Amino acid sequence: MTIRDTNHSMSVKRRNPWNWIPTLYFAEGLPYVAVMTIAVIMYKRLGLSNTEITLYTSWLYLPWTIKPLWSPFVDLVKTKRSWIIAMQGLIAAGFAGIAFFIPTTHFVQLTLAFFWLMAFSSATHDIAADGFYMLGLNNKEQSFFVGIRNTFYRFANIFGQGILVMLAGWLETSQGNIPLAWSITFYLMAGLFLALTLYHRFILPHPDTDIKREGLTASKLLEDFLKTFISCLLYTSPSPRDA
């Protein structure tokens, strides 16, 4: 173990990484699959046409695309641990809001508003969780748990696209009421995410290095924002060879 790893491990109020890495990255993957995949299936079952679904859901991916633009603000306000807990709470509220408004007359507009809330909350959660991963583990642990976190992120995708969609289908058949079936499914997701929020509230470690950036001025924040914005443009712009 290097001196850096030793100092790092001493600066973290220890928790066994197995107690929080799997659930943290499951919580990172589930809202993404809910917004990008389950929403499409749900709207189709609720009678929307393919054209309407494309129109309403095609922009929901935007928060994950532009999330680097507000990543400096995550460092400015509170700790990454606080952001994780807060965003998971908002995601749970998003699931509950969708569940509540599915049976209503204006369900499309109202549920879309909560899907947008979930999308921005989930993208912000990604920023905080990935940063917290670096703070909560030493170098050796970071290398070891890369595969673990990816596995549970993918498991969240399988759980969402497979088990939850199957559950909604079974409820449609057993209840004979499509809106009710999907409402129950989203209430269950809200309950699951609330449980994850409460669990992480107590189980996530408290790294001493997880602090908000002190002395960050408006000019420095603007500089970081512009650097990030330019980096995004350079990354997404086609090269002359691609043109």
Positions of the model-derived regions?
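Single conserved hydrophobic/aromatic residue that forms the stacking wall/gate
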Residues: 235-243
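Transmembrane alpha-helix termini and helix-breaking/packing motifs in multi-pass membrane transporters
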Residues: 159-179
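Cytoplasmic membrane-interface "Motif A"-like loop-to-helix N-cap segments
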Residues: 76-88
